[in-house]
Design a protein with these regions (language model features):
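Gly/Ala-rich beta-loop-alpha elbow adjacent to hydrolase catalytic centers
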Residues: 119, 205-210, 214
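The feature captures the conserved acid-bearing segment of alpha/beta-hydrolase catalytic domains
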Residues: 105-108, 224-290
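Conserved hydrolase catalytic core segment
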Residues: 216-224
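Alpha/beta-hydrolase fold nucleophile elbow
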Residues: 195-208
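Short substrate-entry loop that stabilizes the transition state in hydrolases
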Residues: 95-111, 116-153, 235, 258-261
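Domain-level recognition of soluble alpha/beta enzyme cores
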Residues: 1-114
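Active-site machinery of serine-nucleophile hydrolases
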Residues: 49-53, 57-88, 125-165
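Alpha/beta-hydrolase active-site loop
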Residues: 148, 154-196
Length: 292
């Protein structure tokens, strides 16, 4: 497969960072859901996509990585859902062509920042096509693997796998809170490296559980805007009683997420949006059909 950027204003550069948070112990919220050890400090892998005026050609970014991540995805699905998909089904994804480059010259100006925080057993690479497109419009885009919650994270010391669903979490709110600290740790790391970006202008994209973590981050830090893709807000509501918006927030609901929870007796995400989101002047809602 080949992912091309449409209507790009800039070429896109790529780099990965290994973030070690020496003053933060491994949270229970993550080690109870994975093969992380309790006696360790927090480590994160972070992808950064940045705009450049250099020319690029499509490259097979993941071709030579040690782990076949397509196979890892299939193993996770088989383990989680009790199915028997052939492990080679997605192996071709390692050969994907992406319209990005490495070691590109940066723009003279410092670009605004967009942070991507994934959902439960998600991955920093799952929205790569969207993130590259955003970077091509002049943004520095930072995608975080929330180690232990992510489907897999290939740390230098070994691969960490998510092994637990929401039922295995002692408190889902704590997962979201610790994810919001991951975001802060990542931004602090990049700022301390004097990374070439405008960290006074930060927006966030949060998918599902990442929507909760992004909202919590913005409650404590200045955010330009908040983009919520099928946000998982019920655990937040159960913890704090209301969802108080503090910045421009765009709620994007897919058809399967919206319709799939309309008829259940428990509180659902659509009801949270309709009845418990406060400061609605900050909110815009979007509904996507044919999303599945």
């Amino acid at each position: 497969p080949k992912f091309e950027i449409e209507n790009k204003q800039y070429s896109v550069g790529y780099e990965e960072f290994h973030v070690v948070v020496s003053d933060r112990e491994q949270p229970k919220a993550f080690y109870e859901l994975s093969n992380l050890t309790t006696e360790s400090n927090r480590e994160l892998l972070v992808d950064v996509y940045y705009p450049s005026s250099d020319k690029t050609e499509a490259t097979q970014l993941f071709k030579d990585v040690d782990t076949n991540w397509g196979k890892t995805v299939i193993k996770y699905l088989n383990r989680t859902w009790g199915i028997t998909l052939p492990e080679f089904l997605l192996s071709h994804l390692n050969l994907s062509y992406l319209d990005i480059g490495t070691n590109l010259e940066r723009l003279d100006i410092k670009s605004p920042v967009v942070i991507y925080t994934h959902g439960w057993s998600g991955e920093k690479i799952f929205a790569t096509d969207q993130l590259i497109t955003i970077a091509s419009q002049g943004y520095v885009v930072v995608a975080i693997d929330h180690t232990g919650l992510a489907m897999f994270t290939e740390l230098p010391t070994g691969t960490i796998y998510n092994t637990g669903s929401t039922e295995n979490s002692s408190k889902v709110y704590d997962v979201m809170y610790e994810m919001s600290l991951d975001i802060e740790n990542t931004i602090n790391y990049l700022e301390n490296k004097n990374y070439h970006a405008d960290f006074s202008d930060i927006s966030l994209i949060g998918h599902s559980t990442g929507g909760g973590s992004a909202h919590l981050y913005c409650l404590r830090n200045d955010c330009n805007s908040l983009i919520l893709q099928d946000p998982f807000f019920v655990p937040l509501l159960e913890e704090v009683g209301t969802i108080d918006l503090v910045t421009d927030s765009y709620f994007i609901y897919s058809e399967d997420w919206y319709n799939g929870y309309e008829d259940i007796n428990d509180l659902n995400e659509i009801e949270v949006y309709r009845s418990y989101v406060k400061n609605k002047n900050f909110a815009q809602g979007f509904y996507m059909t044919q999303s599945a």
